[in-house]
From Swiss-Prot:
Stretches of the chain forming a coiled coil according to its record: none
Domain GIY-YIG: 13-92
GO molecular function terms listed in the Swiss-Prot or TrEMBL record: DNA binding; excinuclease ABC activity
Cystine crosslinks: none
Domain UVR: residue ranges: 205-240
Originating species: Clostridioides difficile (strain 630) (Peptoclostridium difficile)
Keywords attached to this entry: Cytoplasm, DNA damage, DNA excision, DNA repair, Excision nuclease, SOS response
Protein's name according to its UniProt entry: UvrABC system protein C
Function statement: The UvrABC repair system catalyzes the recognition and processing of DNA lesions. UvrC both incises the 5' and 3' sides of the lesion. The N-terminal half is responsible for the 3' incision and the C-terminal half is responsible for the 5' incision.
Amino acid sequence: MFDIQEHLKKLPSEPGVYLMKDKYDHIIYVGKAISLKNRVRQYFQSSKNHTSKVKSMVKNIYKFEYIITDSELEALILECNLIKRYRPKYNVVLRDDKTYPYIKVTTNEDYPRILKVRRVLKDKAKYFGPYTNITAVNDTLELISSTYPIRSCKIDIDKAIKNKTRPCLNLHINKCLGPCTGNVSKEEYGKMIEEIIMCLSGKEEKLMELLKEKMNESSMNFRFEEAAVYRDKIKSLEEMIQKQKIDATVSDLNQDVVAMARAHNEACVQVFFIRNGKIVGREHFILEGVMDSPRASILSSFVKQFYNEQEYIPKELIIEDEIEDSSILEEWLSSKKGQKVTIRVPQKGEKKSLVEMVRKNAVEYLEKFSDMNKRKYEKSIGALEELKQILNLEKLPIRIEAYDISNIQGVDSIGSMVVYTNAKKDKKEYRRYKIKTVIGPNDYDSMAEIVDRRLKHGNLPDLILLDGGKGQVSAVKKVLELNDVDIPLWGMYKDDKHRTKGLICKEKEIELDKTTNLYRFIASIQEEVHNYAITYHRSLRNKALTKSILDDIQGIGEKRKKSLLNHFKDVDAIKKATMEELLEVDGMNKSIADNVYNFFRKEEN
C-alpha cells in the first residue's frame, strides 16, 4: 500500500518532474517543479484554493513518482516529452501533433537540389519554412522546377562524370542543365541557386529588380532569346509572390502570433506565422481538458507542447496574455533555436491589433468547432446509447474491442484487434497477433486464441465484437468462461452481398436498421477491423515476396540490396560483377564488396 503522507516527507528539494497515478497505475497528471518537495505537497494541503479540476485530480491520486533533474530547464523538457507520450487525463493536452513541411536547398552539395522535407537537420543546408499551406509549398516547388533547370536526382555528380553515366531524360527536355555531364560549371549553376534562395528568403522585390535589369540589358544587346528567359522568370516570380503574400506586418522579423479562445472543456489556440515580415500562413489547435485552468497555464501548456514538436523556432513569440514560466520558456526556446528568442505581450500599437485579429479568428473557429463537435458527439454517443439499449447492456460501452482473423488461402493466419473509446477510433490501442497455437485455417480456434491472449493484459473492455457469426461467438464464449470474465460478446454478421447485416450471440440475432446511426457505427467497426487485418497480411506477404538471395549475404541489408538491384538491374548481373564494378555501387565498401563477390564464387563451386 502506497502511503502518500510518508512519501511526501521523503520528497527532495531539487527540481524535477512528478507523475500522479491512479489506482490502475495510469499516469493522470505530469508536472514540473523547481522544488519537488514544495510543489507536490501543495496538492495535499488545504484544498480551498484549488480549482475544481485539481480537486478532482487529487481525489484520484493513488500514488506518485518523481524524477530529479539538474535544472528547471531539464525538467521542462522532460515534462513536455512525458505529456506527449502519456497524454494524461488532467493535463491540458494538444489534440493533434502537427508538423509542417520546409523547403530545403542542399547547399551542402556542389550542385544543390530543392526538396520538400519535414525535418530540419544540422547538415549545412538551407531551410525555409515551416509552411502551413502544403498546397502553396507544392505550387512553389513546381514553379521553381519549371523556371530553373536544376537537378532533382540523388546521383553522385563526380562519380557520374568519371564513369560517363548517361544523363536522364530531364537534360533532354530542358528540365536540368545536366551537371552529371560535366558541361555546366558550379558558378553557372550556383547563380540559379542564389536567385532561388533570394526568392525563398523574402527578397522577391530585389530579385525582380535584378531580373528586369538583366532582361533589359539582354534586349538592348539584341540577345533576345536570353531576354525571353528572363521575361519568363519574372512572370513565374510574380505568380510565386502572389501565392506567398497574404499580408504585410510592422516588422521584418520571423514571428509567431498566438492567441486563444475557450469554451467549456476546450480551448482553441490560433497561430499566425510571420516570415520576413509577411503572414505566410495560419493554423488552429484544439486543446482538451482545460476545464477551469487559468489562461496563463493553458497558453503555457500550448507553447510547451507545440514548440516541442517544431523544428523551426521564430525569433519572437507575440502572445495575447502573460503566460506561466515565461522566463524558463524563453530560455528553452532559445536553447532550441541556438539564439535569443523573446516572448512579448503587446499592450498597445499595431502588434496589439495583430493579436486581437488572431484572437477573433480563434473565437470564430472555436464556435464552428464546438457546433460541429456537438453534432458529432450527439451522433456517436447516440449510437452508444442505442447499442446499450438494443443489447440490454448494464452500462454504456465506453471501450469496445473488435476482433477479426485474416488468412490467405488458408495459411499465415493473423488476428487483429481494433478499439473504439467513446465511439471514436483509438488507434494507439490497436493490436495485431500472429497465431501461435493453431495449425491450418481454423477461424474459430484462432479467434479464441487471440482473445485469450488479450485477456491476460490491461483493462478489460465493456463490449467485445467479433467479425463473424455463431461459430466465432461460441469459441470465444468458452474462453471468457475459462478466464472467469463476464463481458458482453456479440458477432457482427453479414448478408449475402457481404455487407453488414446485424449482431448475433449464442441466444439471439438482431438485424440492424440501415437508416440508423447504430448501423453505420457497427458497419464502420466491421470494416475497420477487417481492413486492419488485411493490410497487415498484405505487408507480410509483400515482405516475403521481396526476399532475395542477397538477404543471405553478410552486410547486405535493405538499403544495400536496393542499391545493388538499382545498379545492376538483376541478381544475374550482380553474380557476374567484378570487384571494381561492385565498388561503384552507392553505400558499398571493400569489405562488403568482398562478401558479395565471394558469396557468388562459393555458390558456383
